[in-house]
């Protein structure tokens, strides 16, 4: 069945509507005399004519509709999860303004004379010997 067969879909929806009105008891809907006995004769309340459908012939449509609903639900959840992960990863990275700010040289270092080392020591800086960098405590992370 393709989507262009609206008659079968209309029959299924009418049958579901009648079952709803009869509180789920549709056992009496197929009773009658004539060639359509046992074929699930469903009176069409909108047009006044009868549409025949074999019992259980349209059950796969209901299952298909439920499967499409759950597929859309799962797809939406996957997209929402992916979007939330991208937002978390974006928060982990420093903004470009902070990165650019860290690249600027402070004014005290820029005004220091690089040839004789004056300027930093005058402001209380410590001069390190070549190769004598302070050891960082193990496990210390930059936050």
Swiss-Prot record:
It is a single-pass type I membrane protein. InterPro entries: K_chnl_KCNE (IPR000369). The chain crosses the membrane at residues 61-81. Keywords: Glycoprotein, Membrane, Transmembrane, Transmembrane helix. Pfam families: ISK_Channel. Glycans are attached at residues 2, 25. GO terms for molecular function: potassium channel regulator activity; transmembrane transporter binding; voltage-gated potassium channel activity. GO terms for biological process: atrial cardiac muscle cell action potential; negative regulation of potassium ion export across plasma membrane; positive regulation of potassium ion transmembrane transport; regulation of atrial cardiac muscle cell membrane repolarization; regulation of heart rate by cardiac conduction; regulation of ventricular cardiac muscle cell membrane repolarization; ventricular cardiac muscle cell action potential. GO terms for cellular component: voltage-gated potassium channel complex. Residues 82-143 are cytoplasmic. It comes from the Eukaryota. Its main location: membrane. Potassium channel ancillary subunit that is essential for generation of some native K(+) currents by virtue of formation of heteromeric ion channel complex with voltage-gated potassium (Kv) channel pore-forming alpha subunits. Functions as an inhibitory beta-subunit of the repolarizing cardiac potassium ion channel KCNQ1. This is Potassium voltage-gated channel subfamily E regulatory beta subunit 5. It comes from Mus musculus (Mouse).
